[in-house]
Structures are given as structure tokens and as C-alpha cells.
A protein has these predicted regions:
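Solvent-exposed loop/turn segments at secondary-structure junctions
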Residues: 39-42, 78-79, 97-101, 125-127, ...
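Sec/Tat signal peptide C-region and signal peptidase I cleavage site
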Residues: 14-20
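Periplasmic-binding protein-like
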Residues: 38, 113-121, 128-165, 168-184, 187-194
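A conserved helix-loop-strand patch within extracytoplasmic ligand-binding domains
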Residues: 68, 72, 78, 96-102, ...
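Soluble non-cytosolic domains of exported or imported proteins
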Residues: 49-57, 75-78, 154-162, 171-175
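Positively charged n-region of N-terminal signal peptides that target proteins for export
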Residues: 1-5
Length: 194
């Protein structure tokens, strides 16, 4: 009987509602932890010692709109989404396509831009067999549908989702997103977006 008051005090901590919202954690830290690879110009890359690119500037704008500072964390492809899923990073800004598979694992912002699908290879990747190159050049290249790029974050954070959407909407509405797209991508960011 003497432990009953203590147990009653612990019950709220065991409740699923006791889970802290991501936006509260971000506000408490005063920073938005943004994971990226920093190796894919013009999206995000290092110019000397300076991190720059379309998504770097977008991340800074989003953090400013959330009234926190942007903390960019350079990581690799293997850790990028895993780190967001585990809570190591708040978001990933690394030209991530909004796919059904990823929608099962993450919540996403609305798309911030669209890009045409491209054949990309890493600088240090071994050359592909000539047969592949010939196959790609023999036929007329086909252009696939544009790919929506969006910002993934941990599922189950509706307050953060709303805050991120509001920040992105303000950046889109006042023309800053369009200016970034023109500067870095030579394209309109929101031309075909809903």
C-alpha cells in the first residue's frame, strides 16, 4: 500500500502520450539537426571548407522559420535515413524522392521541388562496361516523369509536421523557394507541384 502513491505518479510516464514531440525537442535544443551527404552539387556540397548548395540554403531558411539554428551533419548514404528513423537526426535534406516505400517508414513534408530522373554515378565509382553505355546511347533516351523531392522525418510527430509545413509554405509563398531554385537548379521549384 505504501508504494501505491509512487506507482500512481509513474503511470503518466508509461503512457504513450508521454512521448515528447519532435518539435519540442528541437525547440529545447534550439537547433534543427539536418543530415546530408555534402557530395552532390548543386543540392549540397562543400566549396572548400564551406557547406553550400540548394538544400543547404533551404535548410537554413527552414531553421530560421522555426526560430532555431540549422545544425548540418554530414553523413553517408548508409546512415542518412537510418539516422532520421532512429532520432539521431531530425530531418534529411539530401534530394530524397518521395516514394511509396519510404512513405511506409517516414512522414514527409510536401515536396519542395521536382527533378527529372537522371543517371548518376559517384566520382570514385568504377567505370561501367561499355555494353551499358552503348545500350544507353543506341536508343533514344527516354525521359521519365519528374520526381518529387521531400523532407523525411520520424513518423508520429504531427506538431513538427505542421510546423515544417507552415515554414515551407511561408518560404514558397514569399518567393524565397523560387529564388533558390533559380539560383541553384535553373528551374522553377513549384512549377508542377500541387
Amino acid at each position: 500500500m505504501r508504494f501505491l502513491p509512487g506507482l500512481i505518479c509513474l503511470l503518466p510516464l508509461l503512457s504513450p502520450l508521454a512521448h515528447a514531440e519532435l518539435i519540442d525537442d528541437i525547440n529545447d535544443r534550439g537547433e534543427l539537426r539536418i543530415a546530408l551527404e555534402a557530395n552532390t552539387p548543386p543540392f549540397n556540397f562543400k566549396d572548400g571548407d564551406t557547406l553550400t548548395g540548394f538544400e543547404v540554403e533551404l535548410g537554413q531558411l527552414l531553421a530560421n522559420e522555426l526560430d532555431v539554428r540549422a545544425d548540418f551533419i554530414i553523413t553517408d548514404e548508409a546512415d542518412l535515413l537510418q539516422g532520421v528513423e532512429s532520432g539521431k537526426y531530425d530531418v534529411a535534406l539530401n534530394h530524397i524522392a518521395l516514394t511509396p516505400e519510404l512513405k511506409d517508414r517516414f512522414d514527409f513534408s510536401e515536396p519542395y521541388t521536382q527533378v527529372n530522373a537522371q543517371l548518376l554515378a559517384k566520382k570514385d565509382e568504377q567505370p561501367r562496361p561499355l555494353v551499358l553505355v552503348q545500350t544507353l546511347t543506341e536508343e533514344k533516351p527516354k525521359v521519365g516523369p519528374p520526381v518529387d523531392l521531400a523532407i523525411p522525418f520520424q513518423k508520429g510527430n504531427p506538431a513538427f509536421h505542421a510546423s515544417l509545413e507552415n515554414a515551407l509554405q511561408r518560404i514558397r509563398t514569399d518567393g524565397r523557394l523560387e529564388a533558390l531554385s533559380q539560383k541553384w537548379l535553373n528551374a522553377q521549384a513549384t512549377e508542377n507541384l500541387k
